[in-house]
């Protein structure tokens, strides 16, 4: 999607950008990638398969996806990421940040994930936590919106209902985490 458009501009020979997609979006995503030569160095794989050959990838990044993976699927994707990364390879995560103590069902319905949960799953799958950043923090986000994170921009699921209020909050409060595969 959007991040693939950004990152594809920075991939040069012999590099490859591997874009992993869920099966639901695969056909439309492939069509988009085929429509522009800018995406010529983009390889598309399914999230439910091996992401890449073992120990072959320098870095993996995921933006605002963890809430879609909550449960066993998250373990599976983190495990596949660990296998694909070279020793010392990095795994960057940006995700809507839930308040500490938020339970799994509330995370699923709101789209916000606790930092503790993201870190726990990463550590359980062999990653080391290298760094955290507040670059995507938003203290205006109260995280108690009627349609969860999707109430805020860019989605604005309530359409014009309290639109000005939600636009003034801005995008969600997000955690930014950096993990590494041990050497």
Predicted regions and their residues:
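Core SAM-dependent methyltransferase catalytic element
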Residues: 142-183
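Class I SAM-dependent methyltransferase SAM/SAH-binding core
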Residues: 1-51
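Conserved beta-strand signature within the Rossmann-like core of class I S-adenosyl-L-methionine
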Residues: 17-19, 88-97
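Conserved Class I S-adenosyl-L-methionine
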Residues: 104-132
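A short acidic, Gly/Pro-enriched loop at the edge of an enzyme's catalytic core
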Residues: 50-60
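A short SAM/SAH-binding and catalytic strip from SAM-dependent methyltransferases
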Residues: 58-75
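Short, glycine-/aromatic-enriched active-site segment of Class I SAM-dependent methyltransferases
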Residues: 93-109
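A short glycine-rich, Lys/Arg-flanked "PGG" loop and its adjoining helix->strand segment in the class I
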Residues: 8-12, 75-88
